[in-house]
Design a protein with these regions (language model features):
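Sec-dependent N-terminal signal peptides of Gram-positive bacterial secreted proteins and lipoproteins
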Residues: 1-22
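Extracellular glycan-binding segments that recognize GlcNAc-based cell-wall polysaccharides
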Residues: 52-408, 419-422
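Ser/Thr/Gly/Pro-rich low-complexity, disordered linker/stalk segments of secreted
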Residues: 22-69, 377
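Compact, charge-rich alpha-helical regulatory domains located at protein termini
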Residues: 406-434
Length: 434
């Protein structure tokens, strides 16, 4: 059908165009009366044409509304030359006036997750090396008016040398170190900084993914995230749970491979509550399940890598600040569960992606924008000129083609290249042509 239509369009373009005005013009020897009548007729014709044109515009707008208007999606991306720079760029945008900052070793993802218990969207997370601050982080700190700097982890994570330099360079800032004997103890220590909490969230301490997208749920429920091991709850975790007077809701984020049934039973026995588990078949579907629980009709979503933790972890404090869910994506593939969620959730009009092209490719990013805009990515794309020609061949053109009307699509220049496909059919991967 598509090839036939394209061929017919090319054939039409080879025919000479007949001007209706030339065909209907009066003979040179016509009388003045005929000319006057012709002028009156022309005026009426112009008025009718204008009215018809206005009606067609209104009708087209109504039709477009019925079929689904393409939304003007607000989209932005935060990235940097390295993970430290990405974190700084996020801080400058969302936490420009902060007076507190949390420093995390750039290779210690468990400490970064624990940092969210203290941040809760109020303070930024910046990266440091074990023995020295990066140039990017040092420059960012120099521009802030800080009264407190948190260090996540012990001296084996952020050395005493770094701490001493911070005390020297920022004499008016209080330096507070949050640490434990291991990642689970550090998690429990960070949870102690939360007050009036009646909800608890548990996630695996052996991978960053589940705990990362759980941060938006933690902000929604005003709950700390406690990292756990499948070997059982640590003593510090048990003590923290027992220190809470009244517990309302208890949630495990992640499947049984991440947090097994035995640990779930321990949590239920300690909290005296039935535990809710949020999980999907993989981390991508799990992030969708959590997103649905955070907000059924979100205005904004955050996407970040489900494969590389460095850039992704910076998104946690942003998600808490703007109350937006985090969706995990692959580098150059938009997983089916995430794609369907974006397509079906009509409330979304803003997309924030955190991470560079090495973690989320340009094609993947543009696919997300297109899906959120409301475009049916399974159909070929027509420009406005192509629409007029297609209508001559089929009245049901909207069943087969998409007619974009916003800034994301360039007009098609040649009719023999009328059909531009946005789908690159590789398993679950949809990538628009650049």
């Amino acid at each position: 059908m598509k090839k036939l239509v394209a061929l017919m369009l090319v054939c039409m373009l080879s025919f000479p165009v007949v001007s209706i005005a030339d065909k209907d013009s009066p003979n040179e020897g016509a009388s003045e009366k005929v000319e006057a009548n012709a002028n009156d007729t022309a005026k009426k014709s112009d008025a009718n044409a204008k009215a018809k044109d206005e009606n067609e515009k209104k009708q087209e707008q109504i039709t477009t509304n019925e079929d689904g208007v393409f939304k003007n999606v607000i989209h932005q991306r935060f990235q940097g030359e390295n993970r430290a720079k990405t974190a700084v760029n996020v801080q400058r945008h969302y936490f420009a006036n902060t007076n507190k900052v949390i420093l995390v070793n750039d290779n210690a993802y468990p400490d970064a997750i624990s940092a969210t218990n203290m941040s809760m969207g109020k303070y930024p997370l910046l990266y440091t090396g074990k023995n020295s601050l990066s140039v990017e982080t040092k420059s960012a700190l120099d521009k802030m008016f800080l009264d407190e700097i948190y260090l996540m982890g012990g001296v084996n994570t952020i050395s005493k040398n770094v701490e001493n330099k911070l005390r020297k360079n920022f004499p008016h800032a209080k330096i507070t170190r949050i640490m434990g004997n291991n990642r689970y103890d550090t998690s429990a220590e960070s949870a102690k900084t939360r007050s009036n909490t009646t909800n608890l969230i548990f996630a695996a301490g052996t991978n960053y993914a589940d705990a990362l997208y759980a941060t938006s749920l933690a902000a929604h429920q005003n709950a700390p995230i406690l990292l756990v091991s499948n070997e059982g709850l640590s003593q510090s975790t048990r003590k923290f749970i027992q220190s809470i007077g009244n517990i309302d809701n208890v949630t495990i984020v992640g499947g049984e491979i991440s947090v097994n049934q035995s640990v779930k039973n321990q949590i239920e026995n300690l909290t005296k509550k039935r535990v809710t588990r949020l999980a999907g078949v993989d981390r991508y579907e799990s992030s969708v399940e959590v997103a649905k629980r955070v907000n059924a009709n979100p205005a904004e979503v955050i996407t970040t890598s489900g494969e590389v933790f460095a850039d992704a972890l910076v998104s946690s404090t942003v998600a808490q600040k703007i109350k937006a869910p985090i969706l995990l994506v692959k580098k150059d593939v938009l997983p089916l569960s995430v794609r369907e969620y974006m397509k079906d959730t009509n409330s979304i009009y803003k997309l924030t992606t955190i991470g560079g092209y090495n973690t989320v490719t340009k094609n993947n990013y543009s696919t997300q924008v297109i899906l959120i805009s409301g475009l049916d990515i399974d159909k070929p794309l027509l420009d406005k000129q192509g629409k007029g020609l297609i209508k001559a061949f089929t009245k049901d053109y909207k069943k087969y083609y998409v007619l974009p009307n916003n800034k994301y699509y360039n007009s098609i220049k040649e009719y023999d290249k009328l059909f531009v496909y946005l789908r690159d059919a590789l398993a679950e991967d949809y990538r628009p042509l650049e």
